[in-house]
Amino acid sequence: HYIYKLSDIVSKGGVLLLNAAPNELGEIPIGQANLLRRLGQWLKVNGDAIYDADPSPVRNPDLPITHKPGRLFFHVKEQVDRELEVTGMTAAIKRCYLLSDPKKTALNFSQSGDRIILNLPRDAFVGVQGLAVIAADYEGEIQVSDPTLRADKEGLIQLPVSKSTYSNMSISYDQKFGCTHKIAMPWD
C-alpha cells in the first residue's frame, strides 16, 4: 500500500512523509521498521523512477507515471492481464524494460498515434512487492493529448470511469425563498 502511495504521490509532484515514531525506549516499533525495510528494498530496485524524478506531463489516475529527460517510468500495479495500454501521449518510444530486470531485457510493445501497448512478461511482478516499474526510453518531445472528451465517428463522447470523479450532488430550486440549493458530497 505505501509503495503504491509513494509512486502515486511522486507522479503528482509530491513528497511522501512518514512519521516513524520511536517508543519510550527510543526504538522504532517493529511494524514501522518492517514497513521502512520494505520501502527500502523496493527503492533499491526501482529508485531510479523516484529519486530526482519529475511528474509526467501525461496524467493517468490509474497509472502513476514519473519522468526524467528521455525516459518515462510506468508504475504498474500487479495485474492478471499481461497487456498494458497507455494513452494520452505521442512520443517516439525506442525501448521499454523492467527496472527489476538486471539484464534490462527489452519488452515487446507497439505504438500507434497516442496509444502505447506494452506486453508484460509472466514474471513482471516477481520480487517487486506488487508494483513493477517499466522504463520507456524515448527521443524528442512528448506531445500530450487527452482523448477523454473526443467524439467518435458516430458523434458519441464517452467519459471513462478512470477519468471521472464521483460526486453525490443534487441541485434544487426553492420557490419559497427563490434560490437554488446545491448539495455536494465528494467521494474521496
Regions found by a protein language model. Give the residues of each.
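Mature catalytic domains of secreted/periplasmic carbohydrate-active enzymes
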Residues: 1-187
